[in-house]
Amino acid sequence: MFLNTLKAVFGTKNDREVKKYFKRVVQINALEGKYQNLSDDELKAEFEKFKEQILSGEKNENDILNDVFAIVRETGKRTLNMRHFDVQLIGGMVLHDGKIAEMKTGEGKTLVATLPVVLNAMSGKGVHVVTVNDYLAKRDAEQMSAIYNFLGFSVGVVLSSQNSDIEHKQAYDCDITYGTNNEFGFDYLRDNMKFSKAEKVQREHNFVIVDEVDSILIDEARTPLIISGPTNRTLDGYIKANEVAKQMQKGEAVLPPEKPEGDFVVDEKNRSVLITEAGIAKAEKLFGVENLYSLENAILAHQLDQALKAHNLFEKDVHYVLRNKEVIIVDEFTGRLSEGRRFSEGLHQALEAKENVKIQEESQTLADITFQNYFRMYNKLAGMTGTAQTEATEFSQIYSLDVISIPTNIPIKRQDKDDLIYKTQNEKFKAVIEEIKKANAKGQPVLVGTASIERSEVFHNMLAKEKIPHHVLNAKNHEQEALIIQDAGKKGAVTIATNMAGRGVDIKIDDEIRALGGLYIIGTERHESRRIDNQLRGRAGRQGDPGISRFYLSLEDNLLRIFGGDRIKSIMDRLGIEEGESIESRIVTRAVENAQKKVESLHFESRKHLLEYDDVANEQRKTIYRYRNELLDENYDIRAKISQNIAEYSANVMNDYMLDESGSNVNFENLKAKILYECSTQISEKDFENLSVIEMQDKLSQILENSYNEKMSRLEIKELRNIERILYLQVLDNVWREHLYQMDILKTGIGLRGYNQKDPLVEYKKESYNLFLELVNRIKFDSIKLLFSVQFNQQEAQNLENKANEENEKLLQSSVEMGASEDNLGEAEFKKVPRNAPCPCGSGKKFKECHGKSGPKQGILA
């Protein structure tokens, strides 16, 4: 109450921020007459003066913001016949300040972006504008290029349909580059697999504006971009696990100390499955194993867990669809098909086994990054969306981004009605159809939002039965998305859309529709996130248009059933609600919103938790990529690095074969064998007589230096340096890929440390640090071994870079272009685990000290 009183007197923090920006709007408006009276050439000349001041360092962007915004506004009037509204100027300033501008649907975010884009492109460092799909990237770039070109800026677009690096490089070399989040991220990963700086396509990460920022930085936050290559892992375990899962009986969850009946219970809140004691016994019998949870059966137990999830938590046409005998993910937030992406940890293979289609091979990660860590690389990050305030805490904590709600140019006239809640889904379905019929009879357009393909098909069939013409927009036909959405505001139109399919395309209405009450939005169930519901509501009432929105719910909807149904059901029972009747109450609507807040909180904690783990890997990634970039620099002294590595290798190998600390006893037989095997160099025991430990290390280093120089003496210095650089890069890349694999194994088993009263995150940081130290040493020592062992003639030396690029290209062509995350280990994978990797069983020991003890010995070279 006291807080509300303070807000009434002083206004909210958002109100105060907006007032500050309005003061500057007045100053910009005062300049309008000045620039309006200039000719085109004079206006361009004025702009060039400001640009020179930025490039010379005489002034910074904030110093010239008022003039530049006024010039951009005038340019918009001349080239597009569009004038930036005052509230759009505020949006532009918010973006320039590296914040999120929350602007309602139809408020012209595309035009708003031109203001900070132009201002920040003046430095010549490049500006990126990110959208959610190719259509929007191309459309926005083409529409706004008139402003940019008038002011002397080049505009490029990065599209997934472009096959060549040349096209991408040309786009990135432009002053302003539009594209999708996926393409920007993948180009970054691919750039860090190149063998020369000239082949890279991206420039520095200067300033980025992310359109639909909530979709990309929140909804997609758990979806890493992965470039992966094929691996040879057995898939039989998924088939066996699927057969066993089909024979297991589902039981009902009970509170301890009672024991659940059945073979397993499903926890829908946490999206998990728990196998009961009876279920374990049955599974062991069906698999023909004594102990399902013994270390040798750990992979099989995991595959059974995924099979049970596939059958009980993932529905066809809700979470995935079958197309051309392939399992394709349905994006839970947009309803679009996520072609090329695969569920992680073997779940996708479990779904393929469930649907009896070909089980695709698991893959090995070559490079990966999350959107969270990719976009945090930019010097300045900003975003636009119609819905951000509900996630303001997450934007602040994860990305250090403040959210500013921008007032609408014309007040919103849309009526947001309270929810109608029914006891059963069938009652709700019938009520929705009746409401559609009423609106359709008078010609009022209706947009029906559904949460899944399955639900959209239900309404499609019911409307077809009633002979009501309509369009269905879901993952199965998203190719026609923009056209269907554009027509959704026409008289008599009925459009069924899965979630927020068609986002980014405005639904425009004419005067006749305005007289009928505008577009009618009907939500058929609440989403887990209030933000997604707000996006659906926001399709109506653009730029002061009238409109109506209402949600129709039932106690059988997933959200209410799992998180809030009991309380609402008791309210309905007390009120004596009969079958077919609904309840409309602010109390019930608040109860629904509280259920949504619970889910949002769970998801936020989940994303935050995942980021804590990913930050560990991200620091390592940045270190490796930074070092890789140093190697690509022609001025980098690779020969000095090799000499340093030879010295470290010599010290390391000499220590390995010392029988005591004095150095008087050295196992020279094994030392000679190792040096001959790894460095193709013969050494004599006499060379080391009467030397101290340090002197012996130096002597070995000197011998290897001489041997290496002699080996490479027939090559020209320039060629030699290039060979050294490429071979070093190849070693770094190979070791890094194996390290990513080891990190995946570590992450898979680290959760079990919690049972030993240890914090899994702390343990993960410690273990991953140790793995990284091993990686650094392996890069040093493996590069030495490769440089000593490689044999080639002059022609081969000249073609080395081309060959390396060809091999890289093959890897990229066979890679998975998008992934939910790296898949888990296949059955019998213990045989393939590197000896120094953490054991997959989760014991915390290295594989060679755990399940790898019985593996092959390494002989005298160990």
Curated annotation (Swiss-Prot):
SMART domains: SecA_DEAD, SecA_PP_bind
Annotated residues for binding of Zn(2+): 839, 841, 850-851
Catalytic activity: ATP + H2O + cellular proteinSide 1 = ADP + phosphate + cellular proteinSide 2
Name of the protein: Protein translocase subunit SecA
PANTHER family documented for this protein: CHLOROPLAST PROTEIN-TRANSPORTING ATPASE, SECA INNER MEMBRANE COMPONENT OF SEC PROTEIN SECRETION SYSTEM
Organism: Campylobacter jejuni subsp. doylei (strain ATCC BAA-1458 / RM4099 / 269.97)
Origin: domain of life: Bacteria
UniProt EC number: 7.4.2.8
Membrane topology: Peripheral membrane protein
